[in-house]
Amino acid sequence: MNLPASLNKTPLYEWHAAHGGRMVDFAGWALPIQYTSIIEEHNAIRNAAGIADISHMGRLRFEGPGAAVFLAELLTRRVADMALGQIRYSLITNEQGGIIDDVLVGYYHDEFGQPFYVLVVN
């Protein structure tokens, strides 16, 4: 499949292409969806490990005394009780409970010991 040259490329694009990644247009990004067969890749992940290039995803930082309260209103999972370095899967929903996006939220401290959350969004 020939992809438009105008597609965004992650820092790992050349590696994916050189290693046989079948590249597709994913929301304006050239990303691999498959390398070998679906069954081979499924078995590899189930029996060993797998990684994904998520460098195209957005990262939002939330800090300050109201960060946990704000995220409690935005997300379907609690964040106030997270341990340092912990990551949780959560959802952002609309007023009717429909899913807008699935996200990862992490809890960290900066070099001065100040806490902050990082939200990784699609």
What are these regions (language model features)?
Residues 1-122:
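Basic, glycine/lysine-rich polyanion-binding surfaces/domains
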